[in-house]
UniProtKB/Swiss-Prot annotation:
Annotated protein name in UniProt: Terpene cyclase pbrA
Motif D(D/E)XX(D/E) motif: positions: 103-108
UniProt cofactor(s): Mg(2+)
Protein residues bound to Mg(2+) 2: 229, 233, 237
Motif (NSE motif): 227-237
A molecular function GO annotation: trichodiene synthase activity
Source superkingdom: Eukaryota
Pfam families assigned: TRI5 (PF06330)
InterPro entries xrefs: Isoprenoid_synthase_dom_sf, TRI5_ascomyc, Trichodiene_synth
Cited function: Terpene cyclase; part of the gene cluster that mediates the biosynthesis of the sesquiterpenoid aspterric acid (AA), an inhibitor of dihydroxy-acid dehydratase (DHAD) effective as an herbicide. PbrA cyclizes farnesyl diphosphate (FPP) to produce (-)-daucane. The cytochrome P450 monooxygenase pbrBB then converts (-)-daucane into the alpha-epoxy carboxylate intermediate which is further converted into the tricyclic aspterric acid by the cytochrome P450 monooxygenase pbrC.
Amino acid sequence: MDMNTFPANTYCDSIVRFLDAIEYHDDNLTHDERVEGLRHVHSRTAQYFTEPLPRKVLKDVAPRRIAAVTRTISHFIVYCWSKLPREAQVDVSIYLSIINVLDDEISSEPSTQMATFWTDLVQGKQQKHPFWVLFNSHLPRLLRHYDSFCSFNIMRCTFDYFEGCWIEQHNFQGYPGADCYPLFLRRLNCLGGAVAGTIFPAAKFDEQKLFAEISCVMAQIDGPVALVNDLFSFYKEYDQDEANLVTNWCTVDGITMDQALTRLTDDTIHACVRILEILKDKDPDMLATIRGFIHGYVTWHICDFRYRLREIYDREDLGGSSAKFRDYFDTAINVGWVDVEEWTCQVQGFEVDGPVPKGSEIQAYRTNAFGFSVDTRRPHNMDYVGSSIISMFEWVTGYLKGKSR
């Protein structure tokens, strides 16, 4: 699609309508709490990637990609899993970082490496695909924070995510009339089950006592996790020729992008309002946890400028809800913005092109995103890889020593 045809006013109205519906007000953390959480979670997540197994498995992955992932995911975890104990936050951050670092590996045809997957799994043999090699090592570390039902859902969702990426690498948008396909694929790869599983640690939630409530969250959570992301991604993905929920709807249902945006907005509002309404007279800690996730999720999207909402903010041709959109944007930035220098390590070799940018610019456009601006023209030889990882390790070690004093 041509960005010149982007329905900016309609999109502005959609964001405002959604934020009005959930009564957006992120009071999860103070600024100092965000900084402390980001420093701890990021340093420990970065440290994981200096360990022997991930270094071996990821030897061909550019270090700046790993650095970008660890920054993004640390930011995501601290803002959305804000009520999780710190060590559980670290292990969830590592879990999602592995997924994002290896996304390209899943998106290349995995059939050969997966040929003996189930036999190897049942017989306890070494897996062949790098995704599962790393997860076989990390999952026990993650699951120790959770009881059996939440652990089961984390595992289920991990399998679902891999399958969703396997399907997506074919860039198949579904046949006309296959109306179940778009949401089927979106549920597979949205990681809703992992969110619901990891957000209720055994230390804070009695799984047996709250089994019905947790089961209900498992059923409802895919909508908030997937659709909020799709709504905030609508602008940046408008001119990209990629299969996603919105373009898949257009393909299978024969609707326009404007109609798809209206559907997406309505469904996002319904999903978020419904889960909060269901929980409002249930366990108060569970309600606070889900509300905190949704509101933190909004803050994270607005503070991650890869979603390019600043471009909407700066447009001079907006009417209607533009003033309220800007108010919400300013509120989220005031609550959630933390300059990258306050919490993350600087790693040799991760420079960006052009003049030396300020930390906010680095965070916004280069290092704090799920889509990575890696300079693929530059060869990543072993000296470069080694020195970059060593620099990261030295920074992390120094930081942890300082914390232990």
